[in-house]
C-alpha cells in the first residue's frame, strides 16, 4: 500500500510540474517614473510651504535653486566664495521640528563633501551672518537619508552662522 501511495503522489507531482504557470496580470497601470518624481517634488514643495506658513517665516524667499532662505543677522566684510575655507555652525532640523544635530565644521567651498544645499547656502554669506535655510531632500541627503537621523527623502531646516572666512 505504501508503494502505491508513493507512485500516485510521484505521478501527480510530475503532471503538475508539466503544467504551464498561470500568468499573473498586474491590473494597475504603472506610473511613469518621471511623472512619479514630479508628483513627489510637488508633495515635498507642499510640505515646505506648509512649514513656512505654520512657522510664520515672513520674508523667507526662494533662492532660485529650490531652496528657501531667510537672513536673520547680517554679516560684515567680504562674501564667502568658491575656494574659500569657511568655518560655520549649523543646527539642523527635520520639518517636524525634531532636531537632527548641532555642529561646527570647516569646509573648503566647492571642494568639500557636504550637501549641495548646504554648500549653496554658505556661498555668499558674510562673516557673522546668520541665515535660516529650508533645503529640499534632493539638495540635502536625497533618497537614502543619512542612514542615521535623517530619514530618506527628508527636506531639512538649517540654522547657519558663518564664523570665519579664510582666503
Model-based region annotation:
Residues 1-18:
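Sec-dependent bacterial lipoprotein signal peptides
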